[in-house]
């Protein structure tokens, strides 16, 4: 026992570990293991190779004798075991053979143990209900049989391969029995489910025994639907659509500006103001023309009526009509009507009137001219005709009927200079 905890156990990487984990072994086996580890029991092991370890310990890591050094050496940090580090040198073939044999044994054991546990899969599905009673009765001999195989495998056998093969055959028999048991259990479970009463609280169709199955009558309308009803429904739908469209059109028309009425009103105001506007440029042109005729002493009654329309458009370009009377969208009708109205006004002027009387009447009505200049340029009263009163009355009637337009203001000094130059050039 001292050798287990002594330096001999420390020489082997798994010695201390296995001695601590296997307290259930018999004392004789413990002594044999200690002798194997110390190297003193090698001849005994050669003499009696049939002594085997407990098969339950084969799942642990195999032990290596003292003669065969391990391929791994432990690294110790602070007295504790740490991961093993491989030692230098080639691995021995004996270790490979032993490990392959142990792996084969482990796989065989796991195969038959897994086949034994697979038989209880159905009982695990009924774990919530505690399992079926028939299942427990049938499971009894199978479980005892499996326990017998385990106990027999735990016993020490003389030759290991025969024990392993016997365990394989026993487990194969158990596996052959297991499918039939599962089929029988499934049949029992289906029969038990069929024998269970229905637990639905509210049946789908109320039915009594001995009465035929009657379906409820279908839903019926309170009135009869005819083709007229369908036509009325279509008309009502069309009316709803039309009313919606009319409301939309009305809203769109309300949002649009009232442009046509505005243009008509502007045209009407422009037509009413055209005669008054067109008279002013023609009068200005006639005033200049009559001034030149007064200086020369010539009277041409027909020439004034024929030449003024040609000069009227040019005077119209100089004197722009005021903005509020015309719309910006239609300037061409205003100019054409302006020229036509100027021609009409010039044709309305009486031809036999002398130039001096016309000039005097225009100067009297013109607000821009000064009084001294008008008095200097005015001819003596002896040259006026009898029709001067009628001309003045006609001019006053024109001013009363139409608004007086705002004429282009000529600078005062320039107007006086032009008048003085013209009067000085006239023969005295």
Swiss-Prot record:
Pfam families in the record: POM121 (PF15229)
Ranges of Basic and acidic residues composition bias in the record: 44-62
Record field: compositional bias (Low complexity): 106-117, 416-428
Chain segments carrying region Disordered: 1-23, 36-204, 254-293, 306-384, 402-428
UniProt cross-references to InterPro entries, sorted A to Z: POM121-like_prot_1
Superkingdom of the source species: Eukaryota
Biased composition, class Polar residues, residue ranges: 118-129, 144-155, 260-269, 326-347, 403-415
Homology family: Belongs to the POM121 family.
The protein's name: Putative POM121-like protein 1
Organism placement in taxonomy: Eukaryota, Metazoa, Chordata, Craniata, Vertebrata
Gene: POM121L1P
């Amino acid at each position: 026992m001292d050798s287990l905890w002594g330096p001999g156990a420390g020489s082997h990487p798994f010695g201390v570990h296995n001695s601590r984990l296997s307290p259930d072994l018999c004392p004789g086996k413990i002594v044999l293991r200690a002798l194997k580890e110390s190297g003193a029991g090698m001849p005994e092991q050669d003499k009696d190779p049939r002594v085997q370890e407990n098969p339950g310990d084969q799942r642990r890591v195999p032990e290596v004798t003292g003669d065969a050094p391990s391929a791994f050496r432990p690294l110790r940090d602070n007295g504790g075991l740490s991961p093993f580090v491989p030692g230098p040198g080639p691995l021995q073939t004996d270790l490979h053979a032993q490990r392959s044999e142990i792996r084969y044994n482990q796989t065989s054991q796991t195969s038959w143990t897994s086949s034994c546990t697979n038989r209880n899969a159905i009982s695990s599905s009924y774990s919530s209900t505690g399992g079926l009673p028939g299942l427990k009765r049938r499971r009894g001999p199978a479980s005892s049989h499996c326990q017998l195989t385990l106990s027999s495998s735990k016993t020490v056998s003389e030759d290991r391969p025969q024990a392993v093969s016997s365990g394989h055959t026993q487990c194969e028999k158990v596996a052959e029995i297991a499918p039939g048991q599962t089929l029988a259990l499934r049949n029992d479970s289906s029969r038990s489910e069929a024998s269970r009463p229905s637990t639905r609280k509210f049946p789908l169709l109320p039915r009594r025994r001995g009465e035929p199955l009657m379906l409820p009558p279908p839903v019926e309308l309170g009135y009869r639907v005819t083709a007229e009803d369908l036509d009325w429904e279509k008309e009502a739908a069309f009316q709803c659509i039309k009313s919606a469209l009319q409301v939309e059109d009305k809203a769109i028309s309300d949002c649009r500006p009232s442009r046509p009425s505005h243009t008509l009103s502007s045209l009407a105001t422009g037509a009413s103001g055209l005669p008054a506007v067109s008279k002013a440029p023609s009068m200005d042109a006639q005033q200049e023309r009559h001034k030149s005729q007064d200086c020369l002493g010539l009277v041409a009654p027909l020439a004034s009526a024929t030449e003024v329309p040609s000069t009227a458009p040019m005077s119209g370009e100089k004197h722009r009509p005021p903005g509020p009377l015309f719309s910006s969208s239609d300037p061409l009708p205003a100019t054409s009507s302006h020229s036509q109205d100027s021609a009409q006004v010039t044709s309305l002027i009486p031809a036999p009137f002398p130039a001096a009387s016309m000039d005097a009447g225009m100067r009297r009505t013109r607000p821009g001219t000064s009084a001294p200049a008008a008095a200097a340029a005015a001819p003596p009263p002896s040259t006026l005709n009898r029709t001067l009163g009628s001309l003045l009355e006609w001019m006053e009637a024109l001013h009363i009927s139409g608004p007086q337009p705002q004429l282009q203001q000529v600078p005062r000094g320039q107007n006086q200079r032009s008048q003085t130059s013209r009067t000085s050039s006239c023969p005295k």
